[in-house]
């Protein structure tokens, strides 16, 4: 990890600490030289202080969720945003079909994990391929509902093979473009046959290893009511969110609400796998792709019915099979 051209002010000269040593051991950190390690330790110490200060707000009832140290502890928020996102800005083309809310009865809470149609949490690593993980997650769910078979699908194939559809591998992409590619390609390979490598490679699709097919995609009407109906009646839904904030980088537990979140600046693709209410606070249950050590075992509860916080209902979609 290169030393960024950034200097942290107001920090004393870093000295060895048990928490820093534990962090390096836990996440296998090794740095190029002493200068870089000193810089990373200073970043870690600053994040450690920010986490402590934030959790005091939780204890005082000022916020509804907690944060905790995780694998991003030696990254500034700017570095984190440059590396860990991947939902592209700009036009994605016109949707081929739209799901609209019908104001019918819906379950009070949904968790598709309990129906065994959600694969374990995956890890995109330092590659902006969130869009691929969101897309495979939605297709894995639809494939299960139709075929009663849970198959983990290849994100690496989407990274390598869908560039003609506007996607840019680790440089970012769109879930709807991934669905279009899978449809036109005649399917997507299983993860076991085409494993994830967290880097752009040449396309190695094998028609003999297809795990699922896709017949098209549907864009959900951009309201939380429609998204709730889709999650309840259709299954896990691909969504894009604003995940640019320190609070998201280190989210740990509780119902996430970020007052500075944008409903239109969407930079991260994730998967809505349910919804519910916790201590009177409505939430969306969201599967992330940063491994199980992030958040609540790889998941986050995001505020629901709070003016589309973080844009979760701004661009939902799902594949058809």
Curated annotation (Swiss-Prot):
Organism: Homarus americanus
Protein's name in the database: Digestive cysteine proteinase 3
Intrachain disulfide bonds: 127-170, 161-203, 261-310
InterPro entries: Papain-like_cys_pep_sf (IPR038765), Pept_asp_AS (IPR025661), Pept_cys_AS (IPR000169), Pept_his_AS (IPR025660), Peptidase_C1A (IPR013128), Peptidase_C1A_C (IPR000668), Peptidase_C1A_papain-like (IPR039417), Prot_inhib_I29 (IPR013201)
EC number, as in UniProt: 3.4.22.-
Family of this protein: Belongs to the peptidase C1 family.
Residue numbers annotated as active site: 130, 268, 288
Keyword vocabulary terms for this entry: Disulfide bond, Hydrolase, Protease, Signal, Thiol protease, Zymogen
Transmembrane segments: none
EC category: hydrolase
One of the Pfam families matching this protein, by short name: Peptidase_C1
Source taxon at top rank: Eukaryota
Gene: LCP3
UniProt propeptide residues: 17-106
UniProt signal peptide: 1-16
GO terms, molecular function: cysteine-type peptidase activity
GO BP terms in the entry: proteolysis
């Amino acid at each position: 990890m290169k030393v960024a051209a950034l200097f942290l002010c107001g920090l004393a000269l870093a000295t060895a600490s048990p928490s820093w040593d534990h962090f390096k051991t836990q996440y296998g950190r090794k740095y190029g030289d002493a200068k870089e390690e000193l810089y990373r330790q200073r970043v870690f110490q600053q994040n450690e202080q920010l986490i402590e200060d934030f959790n005091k707000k939780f204890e005082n009832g000022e916020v509804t969720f907690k944060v905790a140290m995780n694998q991003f502890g030696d990254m500034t928020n700017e570095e984190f945003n440059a590396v860990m996102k991947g939902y592209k800005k700009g036009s994605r083309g016109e949707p081929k079909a739209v799901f609209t809310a019908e104001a019918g009865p819906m379950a009070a809470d949904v968790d598709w994990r309990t129906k065994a149609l959600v694969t374990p949490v995956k890890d995109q690593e330092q590659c902006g391929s969130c869009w691929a993980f969101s897309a495979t997650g939605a297709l894995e769910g639809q494939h299960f509902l139709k075929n009663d078979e849970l198959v983990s699908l290849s994100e690496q194939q989407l990274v390598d093979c869908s560039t003609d559809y506007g996607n840019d591998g680790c440089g970012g992409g769109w879930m709807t473009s991934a669905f279009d590619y899978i449809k036109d390609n005649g399917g997507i390979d299983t993860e076991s046959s085409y494993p994830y490598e967290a880097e752009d490679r040449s396309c190695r699709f094998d028609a003999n290893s297809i795990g699922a097919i896709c017949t098209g995609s549907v864009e959900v009407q951009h309201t939380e009511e429609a998204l709730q109906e889709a999650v309840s009646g259709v299954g896990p839904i691909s969504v894009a969110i604003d995940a640019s904030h320190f609070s998201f980088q280190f989210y740990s537990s509780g119902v996430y609400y970020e007052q500075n979140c944008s409903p239109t600046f969407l930079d991260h693709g994730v998967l809505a796998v349910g919804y519910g209410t916790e201590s009177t606070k409505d939430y969306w249950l969201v599967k992330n792709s940063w491994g199980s050590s992030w958040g609540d075992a790889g998941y986050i509860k995001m505020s629901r019915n709070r003016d589309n916080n973080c844009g979760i209902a701004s661009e939902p979609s799902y594949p058809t099979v």
